[in-house]
Amino acid sequence: MSMTASAIQPRPHGRDEVVAAIQAAALELLADRGPREVTVRDIAAAAGVNHALVHRHFGTKDELIRTVLREESAAIARAASDRGRDTAGLLALLDEHPAYWRILARTVLDSPDLLDGVDMPAADAFVHLVGGARRGASARTNTAMAGALVLGWIVFGEHLSRVVDVDIDGADLAVAVGRVVSSR
């Protein structure tokens, strides 16, 4: 007899466990395949719950995606408040939340309308980290430029390293981001 995921992992019980399992499964699957390629049934199966529970707790797949993005963004903002304004702290936040950045990139590419109206506290946290004491358009411009560099690297870095035959490690990336961030 083969072991199934449900035989190995107990099914979640109660509202809090079910919601947490659905969000964790959505986070993993959305980061892996993007919003267009993931179904409610995929998420429910990975969470070990009936797909009707996804609808009960989140309404629609789109609302689940928005919830995952909003909650991960809030977690990043909380973590950012404990960091200094250095490049290492900024990059550590990226390393600690890779699924969020992949979901964000995939959502921007696949279904940008899903981001309309989603509160993203991580954006304000990055404005503070990158822009520092500066306020207004220039701090936000620097943040957008640094964000584009880093998110672009997350999405295309491996491919670009192969194409241009260069091996860029975390330290080299930190130096490159540091140059952009410090050019404020």
Regions from the language model: what does each represent?
Residues M1-Q9, A92, V127-R135, V155-R184:
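C-terminal peripheral helix-coil segments that are non-catalytic and often amphipathic
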Residues M1-R33, E37-G48, G59-T67:
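Basic, helix-initiating cap at the start of DNA-binding domains
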Residues A21, E63, I103, T141-A148:
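Amphipathic alpha-helical interaction segments
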Residues A52:
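Key DNA-contact positions within bacterial/archaeal DNA-binding proteins
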Residues A74-V108, G136-T143:
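Hydrophobic alpha-helical connector segments
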Residues A77-S81, S111-A144, V175:
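Amphipathic alpha-helical packing segments from all-alpha helical-bundle domains
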Residues A92-H128, G157-L160:
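Amphipathic alpha-helical segments used for helix-helix packing
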